[in-house]
Regions:
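Short, exposed beta-strand-loop hairpins at the edges of beta-sheets
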Residues: 141-148
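Residues that define the transmembrane beta-barrel architecture of outer-membrane proteins
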Residues: 31, 44-48, 75-80, 95-97, ...
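Gram-negative (and chloroplast) outer-membrane scaffold detector with strong preference
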Residues: 49-113, 135, 160-163
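Extracellular loop and loop/strand-boundary signature of outer-membrane beta-barrel proteins
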Residues: 36-37, 69-71, 112-117, 141
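Cleavable N-terminal export/targeting peptides
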Residues: 1-30, 162-163
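An anionic, turn-rich surface loop/hairpin at beta-sheet edges
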Residues: 104-128
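Residue-level detector of the transmembrane beta-barrel scaffold of outer-membrane proteins
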Residues: 32-36, 62-66, 96-100, 138-140, ...
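Outer-membrane beta-barrel "beta-signal"
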Residues: 149-163
Length: 163
């Protein structure tokens, strides 16, 4: 069960992502802030997060560190991702294929009857696959491995260019 504070956080994150979506400009080779949200499987949760994308490094590569929080399935997760992303433009369509991955640090806290237990720190890795449009919209799938690292995350978000 998700607490009221978890619902408030999710609503605020969705509101801010929507606000940024309407004020966003073209997200290309500049650095950007990315707002994302979605669901995960194993554990079954909803999540919201933010990440920073570096300017292009050596052509197609970017470093994308990020943080997100997941709620549900008797568990609260805080994930810290450090991804190396490679981008492949798909012709003149404005769409780009994203692939990458990297290490994940997860902080897990049980809720419900085990709420009194301490937080646990775990490490793992993840692989990212997705698509991004030049206007900033993106969708991605993340496959993870390791203790308490979500096995599959499906999310959408918006990228806002930093000038």
């Amino acid at each position: 069960m998700v607490t009221r504070s978890g619902h408030r956080f999710a609503l605020v994150a969705v509101f801010l992502a929507g606000l940024m979506a309407f004020s966003a400009t073209r997200a290309s080779a500049q650095s950007s802030i990315n707002f994302t949200g979605g669901g995960s499987i194993d554990p079954e949760q909803v999540y919201a997060g933010v990440s920073w994308s570096s300017p292009d490094l050596g052509g197609r590569f970017q470093v994308r560190p990020g943080i997100d929080g997941g709620f549900g399935d008797g568990l609260r997760l805080g994930n810290i991702n450090i991804d190396l992303i490679v981008k492949f433009p798909l012709g003149t369509s404005g769409w780009t294929l994203l692939q990458g991955g990297g290490p994940v640090i997860t902080i897990a806290k049980f809720t419900g009857e085990f709420e009194d237990s301490s937080s646990e720190l775990h490490a793992g890795g993840s692989y990212l696959f997705g698509f991004q449009h030049d206007n900033g919209f993106f969708a991605d799938f993340r496959v993870g491995g390791g203790n308490f690292v979500p096995q599959l995350k499906i999310g959408v978000g918006w990228s806002v260019e930093i000038k």
